[in-house]
């Protein structure tokens, strides 16, 4: 079984499932076993809020444990056998791909095989046979080659939880020299917006409320708080567009593909005066994970 996983700072995504990348350890059984991973005698509640930012994802076991939870969730969704062999298809930003590739592969492909654990009180026995790594963002375009057709140059803007990753593709090939990673992800926007709402209204709105308003979804909230969130959403998009320009890219001259969790926010808050050349939005947060799987399937088919 091929399982594609996008290890985001904000959320863990597979082809079919997404949950927050938070994790809390318990020495004793929690009050509910929902989303609970039991591994080596400890209990881990997966998907609870957001964990402390760790730029090196291999510095602790959190992302490994979240990987096991993601495998279990994907098996559950596919109604597959819980004793199975898995090939993991994962990604890294192209800007750090060469530097981090080997370490991240070894982090996920451990000597302890098969990996045995309980998830939501059900037993899993997983043989991780291999870990394939691909550039994130670019891999999602494996699902949408039409966005590159007849375009000599395209700018890919992946707005993630902590970073905005930029990459220009020339004749559908990534130009490694153009890769940039800006620390302007959605987490920054949400944190700064929450603080601005507190200052202006005295209200302490939640991350989930802010997200819903930024995406234009319904949410019961004081109108003055809603206005602050919407205004901050526009300011956030202006910061991203300005930072992209300062990084040497002309959004008015080159077609752009926006993806990641923040692409939906950008689509809602971008205006005609921004003059973006042929913007395309991949709003599916599962696109990277699905793209990783597609590439491995294509490799097998050859």
What are these regions (language model features)?
Residues 196:
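A contiguous pocket-lining binding segment that forms or flanks enzyme active sites
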Residues 166-171:
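PRPP/pyrophosphate-binding module of the type I phosphoribosyltransferase fold
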Residues 1-154, 173-188, 200, 207-302:
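Nucleotide/phosphate-binding catalytic cleft detector across ATP-hydrolyzing
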């Amino acid at each position: 079984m091929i399982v594609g996983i996008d290890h985001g700072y904000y959320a863990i995504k597979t082809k079919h499932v997404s949950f927050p990348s938070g994790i809390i350890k318990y020495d004793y059984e929690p009050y509910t076993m929902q989303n609970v991973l039991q591994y080596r005698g400890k209990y881990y509640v997966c998907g609870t809020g957001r964990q402390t930012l760790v730029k090196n994802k291999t510095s602790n076991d959190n992302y490994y444990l979240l990987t096991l939870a993601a495998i279990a969730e994907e098996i559950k969704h596919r109604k597959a056998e819980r004793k199975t062999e898995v090939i993991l298809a994962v990604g890294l930003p192209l800007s750090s791909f060469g530097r981090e590739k080997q370490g991240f592969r070894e982090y996920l492909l451990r000597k302890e095989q098969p990996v045995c654990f309980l998830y939501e009180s059900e037993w899993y026995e997983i043989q991780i046979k291999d870990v394939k790594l691909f550039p994130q963002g670019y891999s999602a375009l494996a699902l949408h080659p039409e966005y590159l057709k007849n375009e000599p140059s395209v700018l890919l803007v992946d707005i993630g939880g902590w970073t905005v990753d930029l990459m220009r593709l020339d004749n559908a090939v990534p130009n490694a020299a153009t890769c940039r990673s800006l620390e302007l992800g959605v987490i920054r926007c949400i944190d700064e917006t929450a603080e601005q709402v507190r200052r202006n209204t005295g209200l302490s709105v939640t991350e989930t409320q802010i997200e819903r308003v930024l995406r234009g979804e319904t949410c019961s909230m004081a109108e003055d708080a809603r206005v602050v969130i919407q205004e901050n959403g526009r300011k956030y998009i202006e910061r991203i567009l300005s930072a992209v320009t300062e990084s040497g890219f002309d959004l008015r001259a080159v077609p752009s593909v926006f993806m990641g969790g923040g692409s939906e926010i950008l689509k809602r808050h971008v205006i005609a005066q921004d003059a973006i050349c042929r913007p395309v939005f991949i709003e599916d947060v599962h696109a990277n994970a699905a793209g990783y799987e597609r590439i491995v399937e294509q490799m097998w088919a050859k």
